[in-house]
Amino acid sequence: MNGFFKNLSLWLVIGLLMVMLFNLFNSPQGPGQSITFSDFSEMVAQGKVTAVTLEGRTVRGLSTDGSPFSSRVPDNYDLTKDLLAHGVDIDVREPEGTPMLMQILISWFPMLLLIAVWIYFMRQMQSGGGRGAMSFGKSKAKLMSDKAAKVTFQDVAGIEEAKEELQEVVQFLKDPHKFQRLGGKIPKGVLLVGPPGTGKTLLARAIAGEANVPFFNLSGSDFVEMFVGVGAARVRDMFEQGKKNAPCIIFIDEIDAVGRHRGAGLGGGHDEREQTLNQLLVEMDGFESTEGVIMVAATNRPDVLDPALLRPGRFDRQVTVPNPDILGRTQILKVHMNKVPLSDSVDAEVIARATPGFSGADLANLVNEAALIAAQLDKRVVEMEDFENAKDKVMMGKPRRSAVISEKERKTTAYHEAGHAVVAMALDGADPVHKVTIIPRGRALGLTMQLPLEDRYTYSKVQLEQNIAILMGGRLAEELVLNQLTTGAGNDIQRATDLARKMICSYGMSDTLGPLTYGENEQEIFLGREITQHKSVSEETARRIDAEVFDIVDRNYKRAKQILTDKMEVLHTMAQALLERETIDADEVIKLMAGEPAETALKPLKKKDERANKPTPTVADDGEQGDQTAKDAVAGSVTQAEDDVEGSTRTATEASTQEVVSKDTPEGDDKDR
């Protein structure tokens, strides 16, 4: 109602101003034709004027034929003598002046207009939901609307333990006496920790949908922006809003943007982010009570958060939200598949087994890609084949059918990928090969993909050395068969070297150097750690480490070489099969490894088989080479052109290696994902 009257008064003022301006610039003119003073004087001299009315310097009159007219008289000209001399009736009137109020309004109108515009902009800057320039000290926390689409815990699957902990917080808000009668206190803060895409923000939205209390949400980057000093003010305002709406929940997404370890930057205590963090620490557990305000935050970098932020009393609970296991993946797939029309052949458990390391967001994307692929083919339901194609697209990238590659490079790529596959299948305990292809995907010319039989969280020394041998298989196949070395194995060598060095320096897998950690963990500057790195390895120890790394790589290089030498016939058969079909699956690889000829080992081609369309054998200039994006424990091996392309190869070992790193070092988890 107030808004109605405000708008009504605004339109009334606008209408009044328009009337004033109209009256000002469109003053009514007297009746009759306006003539020049010369014509008027001539008419008087000829006796054609019978009567006139003088209003200041304006003269109005009637001619002898009865027509009215008007004219202007020059200043300091005595008109009355001429008029009296010719017998013209004269009537003198005071000129119609502008009313006093109108004169005041006209004189003050520009100033009043400027004042009104200034007031308008000041009100706009001080309001507008925190978006005004004068509201930079106001919190940008948004209150979740009741009209927003609600998410409940039934929409969250695959992370049951995290759901249970957060459901307890919701129950406390709904029925606090149940816990208080035994002396229990509600947690002041809950920190959701986990890799990207695991459902941390979705859990927060589920809390908002279940708690039935005010829910404020904002990002960690909303505190520190353009102006200096507003971060602390926004924190204070955020908690003021929370206290007014208590009991309530405040959710801060990506809290590492504001909660990083203090002392990392060059600004010291005057750093804007540190000032904001200090205010956040005080508000969460300081002199003033924040009873009824529960903080929920999410981050995928808990290692860089300030210890004072993580202590009990601030974030009492740290809820880990990991990547789902096979059971969790099955549940997540079923949640997303409920929104898609499916064929009877689709089995969520089979898809879950083939997607180890996938997060909830990855699985949602997989279902969406499968639906898009089916829609492009004008299907009425999504079939299992669509999910298989979507999985290949997500893991390996979209096939580049337009890429033109010379026959020589195709042959090099085929032997490179066959080398990886033969070594992987020959090693006992290695992850089985799922698919081998020389179809360019993304920025890769080919790849070998392995899938583990089950979820894997740790790796033994034997498995890591097997991975190094698999990495060496591509280069060795080129060397043994084609008698050449290409840049395609460059990334294989780099990853094998990195893995061997981690085995020595991080995992203590050296017989001579012992179970020790050598060198500081690699930390990025400004991420909550010291700027300088202290060297903790002597030159003698560094030489011994280099020797150990070389020994591990060389030993597995020779191991892979022996395997390929013994399986040379299989290597030739598999490479020829790749040149013919471009893609072979797990069953075909197993039959080829058993010594079956390609004629019986390879499946008949389908009409729409992706292997039926081969790239034109024309010289290609690939230019840039990059890594293949794959999931944890998922394989990919890339071979590049021998002449002008910088090598960059990725095999299953890379994914396995990075998963090992992610289990033992938090920074490895972030880099991998």
Swiss-Prot record:
Residues 648-660 have a biased composition (Polar residues). Residues 29-100 are periplasmic. It is found in: Cell inner membrane. It holds the Pfam family AAA. Binds 1 zinc ion per subunit. One of its GO terms (cellular component) is plasma membrane. The chain crosses the membrane at residues 8-28, 101-121. Residues 601-673 are annotated as: Disordered. SUPFAM superfamilies: FtsH protease domain-like, P-loop containing nucleoside triphosphate hydrolases. The active site is at E417. One of its GO terms (molecular function) is ATP hydrolysis activity. Residues 1-7, 122-673 are cytoplasmic. Its EC number is 3.4.24.-. In the central section; belongs to the AAA ATPase family. Homohexamer. This is ATP-dependent zinc metalloprotease FtsH. It comes from Magnetococcus marinus (strain ATCC BAA-1437 / JCM 17883 / MC-1). The gene is ftsH.
